Protein backbone atom coordinates (compact mmCIF):
# COMPACT_ATOMS: atom_id res chain seq x y z
CA UNK A 1 0.00 0.00 0.00
CA UNK A 2 1.27 3.43 -0.96
CA UNK A 3 0.59 6.24 1.48
CA UNK A 4 -0.18 9.82 0.39
CA UNK A 5 3.28 11.06 1.33
CA UNK A 6 4.89 8.33 -0.72
CA UNK A 7 2.77 9.16 -3.75
CA UNK A 8 3.79 12.79 -3.51
CA UNK A 9 7.45 11.81 -3.15
CA UNK A 10 7.21 9.49 -6.16
CA UNK A 11 5.61 12.21 -8.28
CA UNK A 12 8.33 14.68 -7.27
CA UNK A 13 11.02 12.22 -8.33
CA UNK A 14 9.22 11.51 -11.61
CA UNK A 15 8.90 15.13 -12.59
CA UNK A 16 12.42 16.09 -11.49
CA UNK A 17 13.48 19.01 -9.37
CA UNK A 18 11.31 22.10 -9.60
CA UNK A 19 13.44 25.18 -10.29
CA UNK A 20 10.55 27.51 -11.19
CA UNK A 21 12.72 28.94 -13.97
CA UNK A 22 11.02 30.41 -17.02
CA UNK A 23 11.32 28.32 -20.16
CA UNK A 24 12.96 30.13 -23.10
CA UNK A 25 10.08 29.78 -25.57
CA UNK A 26 10.28 31.67 -28.86
CA UNK A 27 7.01 33.45 -29.57
CA UNK A 28 5.65 33.92 -33.07
CA UNK A 29 2.92 36.40 -33.99
CA UNK A 30 0.14 34.54 -35.84
CA UNK A 31 -2.27 37.45 -36.00
CA UNK A 32 -5.16 38.76 -33.93
CA UNK A 33 -8.51 37.16 -33.17
CA UNK A 34 -11.52 39.06 -34.47
CA UNK A 35 -13.64 38.39 -31.39
CA UNK A 36 -13.15 38.30 -27.63
CA UNK A 37 -12.34 34.60 -27.01
CA UNK A 38 -14.20 32.93 -24.17
CA UNK A 39 -13.66 29.31 -25.25
CA UNK A 40 -11.14 27.46 -27.41
CA UNK A 41 -11.64 23.86 -28.63
CA UNK A 42 -9.54 21.69 -30.94
CA UNK A 43 -11.19 19.06 -33.11
CA UNK A 44 -10.48 15.41 -32.39
CA UNK A 45 -7.24 15.18 -34.43
CA UNK A 46 -5.96 18.66 -33.57
CA UNK A 47 -5.90 20.02 -37.12
CA UNK A 48 -8.48 22.75 -36.49
CA UNK A 49 -9.36 24.96 -33.55
CA UNK A 50 -12.60 26.79 -32.84
CA UNK A 51 -12.56 30.10 -30.98
CA UNK A 52 -15.92 31.15 -29.53
CA UNK A 53 -17.18 34.28 -27.81
CA UNK A 54 -19.87 36.96 -27.99
CA UNK A 55 -22.24 34.38 -29.58
CA UNK A 56 -19.87 33.93 -32.54
CA UNK A 57 -17.34 31.32 -33.59
CA UNK A 58 -14.33 31.22 -35.88
CA UNK A 59 -12.60 28.01 -36.99
CA UNK A 60 -8.88 28.29 -37.73
CA UNK A 61 -6.27 25.85 -38.94
CA UNK A 62 -4.36 24.90 -35.81
CA UNK A 63 -0.78 25.51 -36.98
CA UNK A 64 -0.99 28.64 -39.16
CA UNK A 65 -4.26 29.99 -37.68
CA UNK A 66 -5.77 30.56 -41.11
CA UNK A 67 -9.48 31.37 -41.07
CA UNK A 68 -11.49 28.35 -42.24
CA UNK A 69 -15.07 29.41 -41.51
CA UNK A 70 -17.10 31.45 -39.04
CA UNK A 71 -20.67 32.05 -37.89
CA UNK A 72 -23.02 32.87 -35.05
CA UNK A 73 -23.85 30.41 -32.29
CA UNK A 74 -24.92 30.02 -28.68
CA UNK A 75 -22.79 26.86 -28.29
CA UNK A 76 -20.23 25.00 -30.39
CA UNK A 77 -19.07 21.35 -30.23
CA UNK A 78 -16.86 19.12 -32.35
CA UNK A 79 -17.62 15.58 -33.46
CA UNK A 80 -15.60 12.79 -31.89
CA UNK A 81 -14.56 11.46 -35.31
CA UNK A 82 -15.06 13.67 -38.38
CA UNK A 83 -12.27 16.17 -39.12
CA UNK A 84 -14.59 19.00 -40.16
CA UNK A 85 -17.76 17.86 -38.40
CA UNK A 86 -19.26 20.13 -35.75
CA UNK A 87 -22.60 21.31 -34.39
CA UNK A 88 -23.87 24.68 -33.23
CA UNK A 89 -26.81 25.63 -31.05
CA UNK A 90 -28.33 28.35 -33.21
CA UNK A 91 -31.35 29.04 -30.98
CA UNK A 92 -32.91 27.44 -27.89
CA UNK A 93 -34.90 25.09 -30.15
CA UNK A 94 -32.63 24.56 -33.16
CA UNK A 95 -29.27 22.79 -33.57
CA UNK A 96 -27.40 22.76 -36.88
CA UNK A 97 -24.98 20.00 -37.85
CA UNK A 98 -22.07 20.53 -40.26
CA UNK A 99 -20.24 17.76 -42.14
CA UNK A 100 -16.83 18.66 -43.55
CA UNK A 101 -17.60 22.35 -42.81
CA UNK A 102 -20.84 22.29 -44.83
CA UNK A 103 -24.32 22.44 -43.31
CA UNK A 104 -25.81 18.95 -43.24
CA UNK A 105 -28.73 18.62 -40.82
CA UNK A 106 -31.03 20.69 -38.62
CA UNK A 107 -32.16 19.17 -35.34
CA UNK A 108 -35.14 20.41 -33.38
CA UNK A 109 -34.57 18.85 -29.93
CA UNK A 110 -37.50 17.06 -28.30
CA UNK A 111 -37.38 19.33 -25.25
CA UNK A 112 -38.96 22.61 -24.22
CA UNK A 113 -35.63 24.39 -24.60
CA UNK A 114 -32.01 23.44 -25.21
CA UNK A 115 -29.59 25.03 -22.77
CA UNK A 116 -26.28 23.69 -24.04
CA UNK A 117 -24.43 21.25 -26.30
CA UNK A 118 -22.00 18.39 -25.68
CA UNK A 119 -19.72 17.00 -28.38
CA UNK A 120 -18.20 13.57 -28.87
CA UNK A 121 -19.45 10.43 -30.60
CA UNK A 122 -23.06 11.64 -30.35
CA UNK A 123 -24.47 15.15 -30.21
CA UNK A 124 -25.63 15.85 -26.68
CA UNK A 125 -28.32 18.48 -26.12
CA UNK A 126 -28.75 19.76 -22.59
CA UNK A 127 -32.49 19.92 -21.98
CA UNK A 128 -34.28 22.48 -19.86
CA UNK A 129 -35.96 19.62 -17.97
CA UNK A 130 -32.72 18.36 -16.34
CA UNK A 131 -31.91 15.87 -19.09
CA UNK A 132 -29.47 15.26 -21.91
CA UNK A 133 -30.72 14.13 -25.33
CA UNK A 134 -28.36 12.30 -27.68
CA UNK A 135 -28.54 12.53 -31.48
CA UNK A 136 -26.68 10.77 -34.29
CA UNK A 137 -24.18 12.91 -36.18
CA UNK A 138 -24.85 11.44 -39.64
CA UNK A 139 -28.64 11.13 -39.67
CA UNK A 140 -29.63 13.61 -37.00
CA UNK A 141 -31.89 10.93 -35.50
CA UNK A 142 -32.85 10.96 -31.82
CA UNK A 143 -30.97 8.17 -30.01
CA UNK A 144 -31.93 8.40 -26.35
CA UNK A 145 -32.85 10.72 -23.50
CA UNK A 146 -30.98 10.40 -20.20
CA UNK A 147 -32.76 12.03 -17.26
CA UNK A 148 -29.83 13.65 -15.46
CA UNK A 149 -28.83 17.31 -15.17
CA UNK A 150 -25.59 17.00 -17.12
CA UNK A 151 -22.74 19.40 -16.39
CA UNK A 152 -20.30 17.78 -18.83
CA UNK A 153 -20.14 14.68 -21.04
CA UNK A 154 -16.94 12.67 -21.57
CA UNK A 155 -16.76 10.04 -24.34
CA UNK A 156 -14.17 7.29 -24.52
CA UNK A 157 -12.06 7.19 -27.70
CA UNK A 158 -13.82 4.03 -28.87
CA UNK A 159 -17.25 5.61 -28.37
CA UNK A 160 -18.60 2.63 -26.43
CA UNK A 161 -18.49 4.32 -23.01
CA UNK A 162 -19.56 7.74 -21.78
CA UNK A 163 -19.35 9.54 -18.45
CA UNK A 164 -22.09 12.07 -17.71
CA UNK A 165 -20.99 14.42 -14.92
CA UNK A 166 -23.52 16.27 -12.77
CA UNK A 167 -23.07 18.84 -10.00
CA UNK A 168 -22.72 16.17 -7.30
CA UNK A 169 -21.65 12.97 -9.07
CA UNK A 170 -21.32 11.16 -12.38
CA UNK A 171 -22.80 8.22 -14.28
CA UNK A 172 -20.79 5.89 -16.51
CA UNK A 173 -22.83 4.26 -19.27
CA UNK A 174 -22.11 1.91 -22.14
CA UNK A 175 -23.26 2.87 -25.65
CA UNK A 176 -24.25 0.23 -28.20
CA UNK A 177 -23.83 1.72 -31.68
CA UNK A 178 -24.76 -1.65 -33.23
CA UNK A 179 -28.25 -1.33 -31.75
CA UNK A 180 -28.68 2.18 -33.14
CA UNK A 181 -27.54 1.59 -36.74
CA UNK A 182 -30.27 -0.87 -37.89
CA UNK A 183 -33.02 1.11 -36.17
CA UNK A 184 -31.92 4.28 -37.98
CA UNK A 185 -31.62 2.44 -41.32
CA UNK A 186 -35.13 0.96 -41.03
CA UNK A 187 -36.73 4.13 -39.69
CA UNK A 188 -37.61 2.53 -36.35
CA UNK A 189 -36.78 5.51 -34.15
CA UNK A 190 -39.39 6.63 -31.63
CA UNK A 191 -39.73 10.44 -31.53
CA UNK A 192 -40.44 10.26 -27.78
CA UNK A 193 -38.10 7.47 -26.60
CA UNK A 194 -35.44 7.20 -29.29
CA UNK A 195 -33.89 3.74 -29.68
CA UNK A 196 -34.21 1.15 -26.92
CA UNK A 197 -31.12 -0.76 -25.84
CA UNK A 198 -28.56 1.86 -26.84
CA UNK A 199 -27.47 2.90 -23.32
CA UNK A 200 -26.92 0.88 -20.15
CA UNK A 201 -25.78 2.18 -16.77
CA UNK A 202 -22.49 0.57 -15.74
CA UNK A 203 -21.77 2.33 -12.45
CA UNK A 204 -21.97 5.65 -10.61
CA UNK A 205 -19.20 7.90 -9.32
CA UNK A 206 -20.14 9.43 -5.97
CA UNK A 207 -17.73 12.32 -6.33
CA UNK A 208 -17.55 15.73 -7.99
CA UNK A 209 -15.94 15.54 -11.42
CA UNK A 210 -14.43 18.89 -12.37
CA UNK A 211 -12.53 17.56 -15.40
CA UNK A 212 -11.76 14.15 -16.82
CA UNK A 213 -10.28 12.00 -19.56
CA UNK A 214 -10.73 8.42 -20.77
CA UNK A 215 -7.70 6.18 -21.26
CA UNK A 216 -9.10 2.98 -22.72
CA UNK A 217 -11.83 1.81 -20.32
CA UNK A 218 -10.29 3.76 -17.44
CA UNK A 219 -11.78 7.16 -16.56
CA UNK A 220 -9.36 9.57 -14.88
CA UNK A 221 -10.77 12.68 -13.28
CA UNK A 222 -10.02 15.59 -10.98
CA UNK A 223 -12.53 16.40 -8.24
CA UNK A 224 -13.31 19.79 -6.71
CA UNK A 225 -10.79 19.21 -3.93
CA UNK A 226 -7.91 18.82 -6.36
CA UNK A 227 -7.68 15.06 -5.92
CA UNK A 228 -6.83 13.00 -8.98
CA UNK A 229 -8.71 9.67 -9.17
CA UNK A 230 -9.45 6.99 -11.69
CA UNK A 231 -12.19 4.40 -12.02
CA UNK A 232 -12.19 0.99 -13.63
CA UNK A 233 -15.56 -0.76 -13.57
CA UNK A 234 -16.98 -0.18 -10.07
CA UNK A 235 -13.56 0.23 -8.44
CA UNK A 236 -12.25 3.68 -7.60
CA UNK A 237 -8.60 4.42 -6.97
CA UNK A 238 -6.72 7.44 -5.73
CA UNK A 239 -3.74 8.65 -7.75
CA UNK A 240 -2.46 11.66 -5.84
CA UNK A 241 -3.50 14.84 -4.13
CA UNK A 242 -2.59 18.13 -5.79
CA UNK A 243 -1.60 20.32 -2.86
CA UNK A 244 -0.85 23.73 -4.33
CA UNK A 245 -2.76 24.15 -7.56
CA UNK A 246 -6.23 23.34 -8.84
CA UNK A 247 -5.39 21.54 -12.07
CA UNK A 248 -7.43 20.25 -14.96
CA UNK A 249 -7.06 16.83 -16.56
CA UNK A 250 -5.74 17.71 -20.00
CA UNK A 251 -6.53 16.00 -23.29
CA UNK A 252 -2.90 14.90 -23.67
CA UNK A 253 -2.28 11.38 -22.38
CA UNK A 254 1.48 11.85 -21.89
CA UNK A 255 1.12 12.64 -18.18
CA UNK A 256 -1.22 9.70 -17.70
CA UNK A 257 1.20 7.38 -19.49
CA UNK A 258 3.96 8.48 -17.10
CA UNK A 259 1.76 7.64 -14.12
CA UNK A 260 0.88 4.23 -15.48
CA UNK A 261 4.42 3.33 -16.49
CA UNK A 262 6.33 4.67 -13.49
CA UNK A 263 3.96 4.16 -10.56
CA UNK A 264 1.64 1.47 -11.81
CA UNK A 265 -2.13 1.82 -11.43
CA UNK A 266 -2.56 -1.43 -9.52
CA UNK A 267 -0.13 -0.32 -6.80
CA UNK A 268 -2.31 2.61 -5.78
CA UNK A 269 -4.67 2.86 -2.85
CA UNK A 270 -8.13 1.38 -3.36
CA UNK A 271 -10.66 3.79 -1.88
Positions of PLM-derived features:
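WD40-like beta-propeller blades
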Residues: 1-271
Amino acid sequence: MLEDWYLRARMASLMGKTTQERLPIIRRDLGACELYPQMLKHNYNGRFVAVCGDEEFIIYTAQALRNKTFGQTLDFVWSGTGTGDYAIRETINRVKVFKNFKESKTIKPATSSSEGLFGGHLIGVKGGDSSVLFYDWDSGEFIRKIDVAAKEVYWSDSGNMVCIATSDGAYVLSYNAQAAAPAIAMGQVSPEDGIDGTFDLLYEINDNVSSGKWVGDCFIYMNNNGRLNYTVSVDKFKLLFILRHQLLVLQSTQFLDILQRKIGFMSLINL
